[in-house]
């Protein structure tokens, strides 16, 4: 069969093309080694099934140095990015080097490939969700779930690089920043992942699902995080530096910096193990990594057998959360300033030895719960008692509670028996020192997450010093050290007209009852950076009802209004979130609310937004504009609303579990 390869004719040019309707010059299909002309090539892609470029064949080497693929127009919001830049569709001995890819849902996707090399590619600034958690309170909308990927469900969360059914790969010197996910791998084996930087991402640095026999070494995987606001909440929302799920076994993870992630490591046996009690993500070796400064767990490893040796684990909620771990080694690690350094429920035959604990609240906590779900397959198939620990040769300094152990049997202390420890994995030749250098930023106070993810500290930024709704509002001036000047201020006065980074300014709203200001500073290089806030108080009259006796779905609010009002209150906003009662005096579950209010908006274009779990309906001036009247997890609905006076009505109900209701008006 004759092979046809189409080449770009426009050297170094900038053109905007569609992957579905492209001129003949664009290489839609590449089947041989070649060099693409340098330059920025703007090629849209509707989805992962219509890639900008497809690579198909074997023994192909593409050096894309100087080539940039851009999938979306400049100024497009990151959650609107779509499509796939490069698809590697089968074959053997394929190399992609030095590409720069931005503005897509997925940068590079390789499937059914043997002996793949991805080296020196920059897949930064691709797709990421808009986040709705705020300084003071999280939103459940931002939670993710990576528990199933048998049908590529992970693709809904985007990726810089996505590998499926890849056997034998060298992934090195790639960069993914300021997207949602860095490197995502499923159903693959025998990979070497080293000298990469997957940092400042809003979800995962590296995600692994049914990945075996692979090495992850010498990588910088820092600030892969969401769901954290320093001093307010630490939830993580299933973000992590490294995620290993569903029978990911026999891997080596060594000499990586995995700090400031939602979790550092998030390892889980998988749903098949939850149902059957068999298998797990087992026999992985974690050696010499830095798993520090996680809002939740430095290491979360559950329902599995693994070795954790010589790691640094500092300033996490839990240093190790090891629920249902068995036959695992936790040896020679340095724990410091964790709330609970090691916490294991229902663990068995684990060894905790030769670790140091410094200034932790609790060093070792072991326990079993009094009851377990009788319908859960895992305890039906396995003995899940907490038992059979060897705890020896650990050093403690400044620890408040050395051990806290309940409902746990057969603990051996200070034994002299020999413990067989795996050898240190050999470093890869030319492997980088991935660790954060002395004097650089360390600590959870340096995690700042805005609506697009973690701040990377490379550019100036204004951020609240405390609550974001304070008046006057104190703003920190963050970023590289330099001078700044006040560029503009509308709707507010500013405490200073010039200053230095780092620093602080105070902003006082002058707009009256409605807070509507924007402040712009200019740094020493001429870059502008801004902070704005809009808040229109609404005169809400809120009435709550107990609907526990009303079992029909959805609730009939005409009938609900005939019930006794259990809480009658007034507020200037609707903003509820709780896993229990959303307000004092209400039951935890089965409630309904009717709210009526009036708002006066200034001139301009606005959006009325709701975040709801469960049902919500909204009327504006008597017209139904949002109608999501069913049981659902937290979801966002938006409709436009104009300036002026409006009468608003909100109906809401919540059945069981977590409840969330936010009704707000935001300026365009």
Residue ranges and their predicted role:
Residues 5-14:
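Bacterial N-terminal signal peptides
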Residues 17-23:
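Boundary at the C-terminal end of the N-terminal hydrophobic targeting segment
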Residues 27, 32-33, 38-40, 52, ...:
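Detector for repetitive beta-architecture
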Residues 27-30, 42-61, 71-95, 103-115, ...:
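Extracellular beta-strand-rich solenoid/capping regions of secreted or surface-exposed proteins
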Residues 29, 55-56, 89, 111, ...:
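A short, compositionally biased micro-patch
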Residues 69-87, 117-164, 170-173, 182-186, ...:
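Acidic/polar low-complexity surface segments
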Residues 429-540, 544-547, 553-556:
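Long, low-hydrophobicity ectodomains and other hydrophilic envelope-associated domains
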Residues 532-607, 611-668:
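Extracellular/secretory pathway-exposed regions associated with glycan biology
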């Amino acid at each position: 069969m004759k092979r046809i390869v189409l080449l770009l004719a426009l050297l170094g040019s900038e053109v905007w093309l569609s992957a579905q309707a492209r001129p003949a010059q664009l290489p839609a299909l590449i089947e041989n080694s070649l060099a693409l002309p340098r330059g920025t090539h703007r090629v849209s892609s509707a989805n992962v099934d219509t890639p900008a470029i497809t690579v198909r064949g074997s023994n192909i080497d593409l050096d894309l140095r100087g080539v940039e693929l851009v999938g979306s127009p400049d100024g497009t919001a990151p959650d609107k990015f779509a499509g796939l830049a490069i698809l590697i569709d089968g074959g053997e001995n394929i190399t992609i080097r030095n590409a720069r890819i931005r503005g897509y849902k997925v940068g590079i996707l390789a499937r059914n490939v043997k002996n793949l090399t991805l080296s020196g590619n920059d897949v930064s600034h691709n797709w990421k969700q808009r986040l709705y958690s705020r300084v003071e309170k999280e939103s459940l909308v931002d939670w993710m779930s990576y528990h199933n990927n048998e049908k590529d469900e992970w693709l809904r969360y985007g990726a810089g690089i996505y590998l499926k059914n890849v056997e034998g790969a060298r992934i090195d010197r790639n960069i993914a920043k300021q997207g949602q996910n860095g490197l995502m791998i499923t159903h693959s084996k025998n990979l070497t992942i080293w000298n990469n930087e997957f940092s400042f991402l809003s979800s995962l640095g590296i995600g692994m699902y049914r990945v075996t026999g692979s090495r992850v070494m010498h990588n910088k995987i820092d600030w892969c995080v969401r769901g954290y606001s320093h001093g307010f909440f630490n939830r993580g929302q299933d973000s992590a530096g490294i995620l290993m799920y569903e029978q990911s076994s026999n891997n080596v993870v060594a000499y990586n910096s995995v700090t400031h992630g939602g979790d550092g490591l998030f390892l889980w046996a998988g749903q098949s193990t939850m149902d059957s009690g068999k298998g797990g993500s087992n026999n992985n070796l974690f050696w010499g990594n830095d798993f520090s400064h996680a809002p939740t767990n430095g290491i979360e490893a559950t329902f599995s057998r693994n070795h954790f040796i010589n790691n640094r684990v500092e300033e996490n909620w839990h240093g190790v959360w090891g629920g249902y771990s068995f036959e695992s080694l936790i040896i020679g690690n340095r724990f410091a300033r964790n709330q609970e350094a090691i916490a294991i429920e229902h663990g068995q035959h684990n060894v905790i030895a030769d670790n140091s604990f410094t200034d932790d609240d609790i060093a070792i906590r072991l326990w079993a719960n009094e009851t377990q779900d009788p319908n859960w397959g895992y305890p039906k198939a396995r003995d899940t008692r907490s038992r059979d620990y060897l705890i020896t040769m650990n050093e403690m300094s400044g620890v408040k509670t050395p051990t806290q152990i309940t409902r746990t049997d057969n603990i051996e202390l200070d034994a002299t028996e020999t413990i067989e420890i795996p050898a240190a994995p050999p470093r890869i030749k030319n492997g980088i020192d991935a660790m954060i250098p002395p004097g650089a930023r360390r600590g959870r106070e340096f995690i700042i997450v805005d609506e697009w993810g973690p701040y990377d500290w490379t550019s100036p930024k204004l951020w609240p010093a405390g609550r974001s709704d304070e008046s006057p509002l104190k703003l920190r001036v963050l970023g590289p050290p330099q001078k700044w000047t006040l560029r503009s201020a509308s709707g507010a006065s500013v405490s200073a007209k010039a200053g230095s980074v780092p620093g602080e300014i105070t902003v006082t709203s002058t707009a009256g009852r409605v807070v509507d200001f924007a402040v712009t500073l200019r740094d020493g290089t001429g870059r502008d950076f801004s902070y704005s806030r809009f808040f229109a108080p609404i005169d809400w009259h809120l009435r709550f009802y107990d609907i526990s006796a009303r079992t029909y779905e959805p609730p009939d609010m005409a009938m609900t209004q005939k019930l006794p009002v259990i809480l009658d209150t007034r507020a200037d906003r609707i903003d509820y979130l709780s896993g229990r009662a959303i307000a004092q005096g209400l039951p935890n579950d089965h409630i309904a609310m009717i709210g009526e209010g009036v708002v006066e908006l200034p001139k301009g274009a606005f959006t009325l937004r709701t975040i709801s779990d469960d049902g919500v309906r909204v009327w504006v001036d008597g017209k139904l504009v949002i109608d999501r009247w069913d049981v659902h997890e937290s979801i966002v609905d938006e409709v436009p609303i104009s300036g002026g006076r409006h009468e608003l009505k909100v109906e809401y109900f919540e059945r069981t579990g977590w409840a969330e209701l936010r009704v707000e008006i935001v300026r365009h």
